[in-house]
Amino acid sequence: MKLIFKVNKQYLLFHSLGFRQPNPFPEWVNVKDKAWKKSSLVYSFFMGRPESAFLETDENKVKNIINEFSKKVIPVFDLIKNSKEFKRIVSETKEYKQFVTNQWNTNKNIALETLEELVGSTLPKKTVTVLITHPKLHNGVHFLGKNIIGWGHEEDWKNYSTVYLAHEIMHSIMIEKLGLSTGRNGISHSIIELMTDNELRIRLNNSGKYFKENNKEIGHPDLRSIEKKILPAWKKYLKKKDKKIEKFYKKVSNI
């Protein structure tokens, strides 16, 4: 498996406007204000809240909304894209991309070998594109049906990016191994966290313990109860020579 790292400006722009995202730096709010003033309708779409633009029930007003959107979507997009603030986001993201690329290249052999050992089979021979976003705008997603990962996060601890790139890779692997619905449920996600967030992290850093690093909780809090239930079985699985992640999933699926 090969990872290539890119900065996609369009993806970066819309990700940076997401309504759940903080501002990467204080000046970014100036661009948001300008976009809102130019068209609150288009801005609502861009920030991921399109439903707020269609609260009207009058069909003629809805048509007017659609007409306004078609006229103003490009001007608002260009306003943001050409702003000095967005250019700063692009510049800082490119610097971060180099950091992530260097870290992955340093760690990829042990990371991929560890995944193959824990999965119990070789990983698919495919190329995955990693779209890098600003590290202060948290991102970690595997796009279903595509060999694409979105990634951006501050380094909360050593080799953070490597661990969570492996985490996103495993989402794809689990879907391939277990099917769409099973590969995305709480048990499979908990297995991914035990495998990458915990076991891989400890192996990469040659130290650490499960569920905590630098006094920070590791992984999703809502998965912790599942993870602790299957942890004894996981520890036994780690000692097995003939590992198969599909068999392990079946074993713990009713715990």
Where are these regions (language model features)?
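Post-HExxH zinc-binding segment in Zn-dependent metallohydrolases
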Residues: 1-30, 183-227
